[in-house]
Amino acid sequence: MLNLGRARTGRQNRSMSFEGLDFADPKKNNNYMGKIVLVMTLTAMCILLLNQSPTFNTPSVFSRSEPGVTHVLVTGGAGYIGSHAALRLLKDSYRVTIVDNLSRGNLGAVKILQQLFPEPGKLQFIYADLGDANAVNKIFSENAFDAVMHFAAVAYVGESTQFPLKYYHNITSNTLVVLETMAAHGVKTLIYSSTCATYGEPEKMPITEETPQVPINPYGKAKKMAEDIILDFSKNSIMAVMILRYFNVIGSDPEGRLGEAPRPELSEHGRISGACFDAARGIIPGLQIKGTDYKTVDGTCVRDYIDVTDLVDAHVKALEKAKPRKVGIFNVGTGKGSSVKEFVEACKKATGVDIKVDYLERRAGDYAEVYSDPRKIKEELNWTAKHTNLQESLKMAWRWQKLHRSGYGSSSLVSAY
């Protein structure tokens, strides 16, 4: 493309002397005039092309507002849960913008989504850090969002105790940036991804939405602080807010298109399902279960495991039910706990591998039982967990793991599904 601005500047700064022109020579004169005509013709053609170009003339489809809630910003949409949420939204005919800095997410997941939904105006990916307020403001300025699903966050309890400031910055501070920018640009719906870690060590089970929030680690504390900011802001705002506190997430897309692919350097902080799969694949020698003397059915900790497909369904239902000036807070779980021993046995059956297990002393800070009371979300959002067979959820996740041994490193659409 011609740099028209520079061409004009150069012509203005150059001294125009007529002494070198021989007007008495018609050949020289015609040659000079021909060059002028050629330059003028090329300039006119460039201007015409620029005016006709959709890049210059037509605004992006993502910058246009449409009736209703049609365009959703998914922060952290390249991550495990966020990518599954983006997939569901796209299947439900929403337009989706994913914003992710890829510190924990996978570009491969975005590429899969782009292959599945190649139509113009359906999906766009923007590489950005939510901690950069100027970048976030620019994104909101150039796009007409109807709602935000805010997943982006570091999310390992163990890591949060080692690097607490990282968690307060990434979760609490970044949520403040998102909320301020939403308010500045009139985006009126927020679906916030929170956690049962905000409850800490409840004295009574099951956990309801009224259970006191007394988090015991920086991850839970950072999430609760973010919740408090959102709730304080909502008191004098027309924003529709839904806060979903979910429990232990497992599983993967039933059609095998997406899965969980944490970075290897973070495996020590990862979910128990990841450790089980690593043991089944021989990446680690076996599992270490810490604590067999809890007051539970078999002495090991009891947790509520929610399939990612059900979790995403809860987010979509929350989006559909969100009302201006209203705040909804919901636990997202099955309402049933499974012990660590039960989980490991289900994983052995799902993988077909007799995983070696070592039993160690209990770890400080772990609590015996954590499971939800899902009655509120059932009554108000008409949501219930459907994928409650632990072995089946693990089997689906294992199938993806076997076909993607390097995660999304060599990801492609798998025809086996």
Swiss-Prot record:
Keywords: Carbohydrate metabolism, Golgi apparatus, Isomerase, Membrane, NAD, Signal-anchor, Transmembrane, Transmembrane helix. GO terms for cellular component: Golgi cisterna membrane. The keyword Isomerase applies. It is found in: Golgi apparatus, Golgi stack membrane. CDD domains: UDP_G4E_1_SDR_e. The active site is at 219 (proton acceptor). SUPFAM superfamilies: NAD(P)-binding Rossmann-fold domains. GO terms for biological process: capsule polysaccharide biosynthetic process; embryo development ending in seed dormancy; galactose metabolic process; pollen tube development; UDP-L-arabinose biosynthetic process. Its cofactor is NAD(+). Its EC number is 5.1.3.5. GO terms for molecular function: UDP-arabinose 4-epimerase activity; UDP-glucose 4-epimerase activity. It comes from the Eukaryota. Pfam families: GDP_Man_Dehyd (PF16363). Residues 1-31 are cytoplasmic. The chain crosses the membrane at residues 32-54. Belongs to the NAD(P)-dependent epimerase/dehydratase family. This is Putative UDP-arabinose 4-epimerase 2. It comes from Arabidopsis thaliana (Mouse-ear cress).
